[in-house]
């Protein structure tokens, strides 16, 4: 004996589930290699540090690897932003300005995807970027820094 209302219940549940998937599958916008290279040029133009700074790509393959790793990473937008940030800093795809470029790329990635980047554009943040390069911070600490702008001071490991 068929119960009235059951098929319509499942139909409503199916439709709601499909709508849920559409909302959840909001396309994440990843930077292209060309955009990351443009951000490097921008970083070196806007933030002068050394006279010898020059926009030069050392490895296109490293840039592509950084993007690929970010796309494959399970996690939220902040985890992916950290992947971009650390990837550019640690894989060093440019002759100059890797940390400055990483900062801009992570910030723009989050803004483009509706995330928040609560780190001040301040030269004092350079020490934190050095700490990221040297694996001083955990990903959770970096996530907290991006979301709330606070992180412990970087101190070099003593030998």
Predicted regions, residues:
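FIC/Doc superfamily catalytic core
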Residues: 2-159
């Amino acid at each position: 004996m068929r119960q009235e209302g059951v098929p319509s219940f499942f139909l409503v549940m199916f439709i709601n589930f499909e709508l849920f998937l559409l909302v959840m599958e909001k396309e994440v916008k990843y930077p292209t290699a060309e955009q990351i290279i443009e951000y490097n040029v921008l970083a070196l133009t806007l933030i002068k540090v050394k006279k010898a700074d020059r926009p030069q790509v050392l490895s296109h393959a490293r840039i592509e690897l950084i993007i690929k790793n970010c796309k494959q990473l399970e996690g939220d937008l902040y985890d992916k932003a950290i992947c971009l940030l650390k990837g550019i800093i640690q894989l060093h795809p440019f002759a100059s300005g890797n940390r400055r470029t990483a900062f801009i790329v992570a910030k723009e990635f989050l803004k483009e995807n509706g995330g928040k980047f609560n780190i001040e554009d301040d030269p004092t943040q350079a020490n934190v970027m050095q700490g990221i390069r040297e694996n001083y911070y955990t990903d959770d600490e970096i996530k907290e820094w991006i979301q709330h702008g606070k992180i412990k001071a970087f101190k070099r490991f003593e030998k």
